Every structure is written in C-alpha cells, then in structure tokens.
C-alpha cells in the first residue's frame, strides 16, 4: 500500500507512482487530496485511467482543490467493505467518514481543507465551498473514530497539534481545528495518520499516533507490510 501526496492533476506524478506500484506489486495507492482528477472538464489524468492497462487501485480522500460537487454525482460502488465514488476506471473517491477495510487495516477517510488562495479563484469553476467539512460531517467523523477504531486515518489537512511549518495561523482555520478536536476528544488514537496539503514529506509523533505528511507531485509514504516501521521517501 502506497500513500501518495498531493498530485494536483499532474499526469507525470500519477505515471511515476503507478510505475513504482507495479514494480513493488503494491495493489493500492491511497492519495491524500488535491487529487486534480476532473478538476476541469478536459482531464488528461481521467483519460489516462480510462486507457491504462492494469496497475493499482487509486483511492483519494479529496482536498480543497478538488471538485466536490461533481465527485458526489459519480457512480457509487462497493469497495473494501465500504461505498466509494468511481471517478474513472480504477480511480475512486472516499467521501468524509468512509471506512474501508484492507486486510488487517481499517482506514478512515476525511478530506477537505480551506483554500488560502480562494480570493483568486472562481466559485463553481476553480473553487467549491464543499472544500470545508461541515459540523455534521465532523460529528460523523468523530462517531466513526469511536465506533470503528481505525488503525489508519487519511485526511487532507492535519490537526493543529501537528507542528506543520506553513505560513498562516492554522489554529484559525476550521478544518485543522476540527480535526484537532476529534483527535483530542476521541478515546481511540489511530496508529498512523496520513495527510497532505502542506507539500512536503515529513513525519511526527503526537502521543500514540504517527503523523505523516505525504509530499507533493510524486512523493509518497509506505508502511512495509501490515505493520512495522514507517518508510517515507520521494519517487524521482
């Protein structure tokens, strides 16, 4: 299993990660948002998925630079014990609160974040208000954390308690604040938490949980097997 960083619709990043997954016989790529597939009507990455032969299954949690309203109209299918949206053949979106079970891993998804550049974007064309999770979605996320006790969580942004170095006050942004509330209030602490949004490859430990920022444009993280130590490295 590979955890891929922000791709922003860059075809070469998808091709590099696909190539590595094939070489290493990894059947699944989990992507941490700002995916870029179907961001615009003409999408070369969607065309790539429609024509590629074989390769891993891709699953994204969605980021702030993704077309949430469109994605939520795509066909719903069952995958790994949960329901996801099929964006293209072999390419899926796991909406907020989706739980998927892969072998011994229970993986809980919760995408979205706030765009700091939304003043430069066009509503309904390059920015969508659904980028930010609602109160009810955070409530569902908390309840899923308590009920299902996932060992892996996948989000686009990270809780405030993760010391990510980035411009701006993350404590004033609704999504990292909401994620922090869920993490701090839940009695369950996942073993690993993968996220993107911050465009660098790094890791931290907060309490019992390893947090891993998965990088940008072809960078990725991978835990060896179903357990063991975390490995983080870029694809070049």
Where does each model-flagged region fall?
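Active-site donor-binding loop signature of nucleotide-sugar glycosyltransferases
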Residues: 96, 112, 124-125, 214-216
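Core catalytic region of metal-dependent phosphoesterases/phosphodiesterases
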Residues: 4, 9-102, 178, 185-186, ...
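Conserved beta-sheet core of the metallophosphoesterase superfamily
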Residues: 50, 57-61, 81-85, 89, ...
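Active-site-proximal loop/helix segment associated with metal-binding centers of metalloenzymes
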Residues: 82, 103-171
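Active-site environment of divalent metal-dependent phosphoester hydrolases
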Residues: 8-15, 36-41, 64-72, 99-100, ...
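Beta-strand-turn-beta hairpins that frame and shape the catalytic cleft
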Residues: 1-2, 98-109, 152, 205-211
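Structural motif
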Residues: 3, 28-32, 152-156, 194
